[in-house]
Structure formats: C-alpha cells, structure tokens
C-alpha cells in the first residue's frame, strides 16, 4: 500500500468503536475452513484484522480430541477474540456457548472481554438466522453484561429492535454463509445502516475484495468474512486484498460519492479557441 494511501486513510477515518473498545482495523476475520493452521495464521496476519472470530463449539471439540488449534498459535495480546455461537439451534444452547466463550476469552488473558457474536441458526440448508431466537437470546445476554453482536437477516425492523435492547453492533448478512453471492439485498442493508446508532458489520456472503469495498462504500462500519479468504486459491493474498478493499471502500465513503445524473455532464469546457 502506498504511503499516500496510508496517510489519507489515517487522516480520514477513525478507529472502529464497539462498546467503548477501539479497533484500528474494520476488517474482521473468521478462523474456519483453512487448509492448515499455518495458512490461517499468515492470512490473519496479512489481513491486519484487529478482531478474529472463533466458533466456540469447534474450539472445545478440538480441545477434547487433543487437536491443535489456532487458539494456541495466535497472539492474543494483539488480537481481540470474538467468540461465536455458530452451530447453535436454540436460545438455550446459544446462551450456554456464549458463556463458554467468555470463559475462553478469560483464559486467553482478555479478562475484560465480554464480546459474543450471537448466532441462532434454525435452518440447516441455507443457515439463515432465527429472528425470534436471536432476539430472545440477545435479551438474556445483554442483561448479563455481554457485548452482543447478533448475526441477522437484513431485516431493518429486527436490527432496530436489537439495537434498542442494548446490542452493541448489528451483523446483517450480505447473502447466505459461505455462498460468495455478495450483497444481495442492498436496499435493506442501506436502510439498516442509515437507521443505526450502533456499528453495522456486514457478515457472510462476501466473495471478493470489491464486495467488501462495496459494503464499506455503503457506510457499513466494518466487514466480517471467512470463506472468501479461507477457500481462495491463495488465501494469504486474498487476505491482503480484503484489507485493501475495506480501506478503499471506507475512504470512498468518507470522501463522498458524486450523485448520479440522468444526462451526461461534460468534464471539458466547450468554450475556447476553435481550431480548424
């Protein structure tokens, strides 16, 4: 990245703030589906992500089986762990896994980390989140001092309800998890962004850097992705591309897009000397 771009970015943008916690990067990265732990570690480093999300069920299962884990290989003094409740189908299960996630963060030395990415998934084919279950679980977790980041369908009404009960950020999906279909419901996503008083993190469905940039150009506060990097032909390069996509999209949003016009508007003057 050029020095001028870095200077522009630092001048224009501020850190991402979630529940009074400051994060330099607006890109969050998942830890699943990588070909190897080394591959994952280098990709996370190349992305410059500040927040890394970990599926607590998978982490505990690996521990019980004696398998090595990214949890052991990452520097948790530099990275902020975002435990997630992926795989939970009920409110009760999501709450139980969230509590385990907070305990895991404590063991990694992040004693003030109450973050949880809340997922309640009742649809096994498309992995769409359960809106009712998400709202119920969020109410309980917020009341028990969790910093809740709920994963939801792009539903502006639900997003506002979750904000009003105390969720610290909202994570609407761009398209189904792992599908790589990009941002499918632009209207609803834009409404959610426009109406929000908390950070909006676009999560799921992003397939390449231009789509990460598009999310940021819309005014999203950040982007969370996993499959687009982990399953890329070269994950380590794709992580770098996603970092640059998020940065360029954020700069474009802050710079102010020109308005669309119905007709062409000449960029060169029509007045002046006529030359035969």
UniProtKB/Swiss-Prot annotation:
EC number: 2.8.1.10
Main location class: plastid
Keyword field contains Chloroplast: yes
GO molecular function, one term: thiazole synthase activity
Superkingdom of origin organism: Eukaryota
Entries under HAMAP family matching the protein: ThiG
Family: Belongs to the ThiG family.
Function: Catalyzes the rearrangement of 1-deoxy-D-xylulose 5-phosphate (DXP) to produce the thiazole phosphate moiety of thiamine. Sulfur is provided by the thiocarboxylate moiety of the carrier protein ThiS. In vitro, sulfur can be provided by H(2)S.
Protein name in UniProt: Thiazole synthase
Protein species of origin: Gracilaria tenuistipitata var. liui (Red alga)
């Amino acid at each position: 990245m050029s020095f001028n771009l870095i200077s522009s970015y630092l001048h224009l943008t501020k850190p991402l703030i979630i529940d009074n916690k400051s994060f330099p990067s607006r890109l969050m990265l998942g830890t699943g589906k990588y070909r190897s732990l080394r591959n994952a570690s280098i990709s996370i480093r190349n992305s410059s992500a500040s927040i890394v999300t970990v599926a607590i069920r998978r982490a505990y299962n690996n521990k019980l089986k004696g398998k090595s884990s990214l949890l052991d290989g990452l520097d948790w003094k530099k990275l902020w762990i975002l435990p997630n409740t992926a795989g939970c189908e009920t409110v009760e299960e999501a709450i139980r896994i969230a509590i385990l996630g907070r305990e895991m963060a404590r063991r990694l030395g992040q004693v003030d980390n109450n973050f949880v990415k809340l997922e309640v998934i009742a649809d096994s084919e498309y992995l769409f989140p359960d809106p009712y279950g998400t709202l119920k679980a969020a109410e309980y977790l917020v009341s028990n001092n969790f910093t809740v980041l709920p994963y939801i369908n792009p539903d502006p009404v639900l997003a506002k309800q979750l904000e009003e009960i105390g969720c610290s950020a909202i994570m609407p999906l761009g398209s189904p998890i792992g599908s790589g279909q990009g941002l499918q419901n632009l209207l609803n996503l834009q409404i959610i962004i426009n109406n929000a008083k908390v950070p909006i993190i676009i999560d799921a469905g992003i397939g390449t850097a231009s789509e990460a940039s598009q999310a940021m150009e819309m005014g999203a506060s950040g982007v969370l992705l996993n499959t687009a990097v982990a399953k890329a032909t070269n994950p380590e390069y794709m992580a770098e591309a996603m970092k640059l996509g998020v940065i360029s999209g954020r700069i474009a949003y802050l710079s102010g897009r020109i308005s669309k016009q119905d007709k062409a508007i000449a960029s060169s003057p029509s007045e002046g000397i006529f030359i035969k």
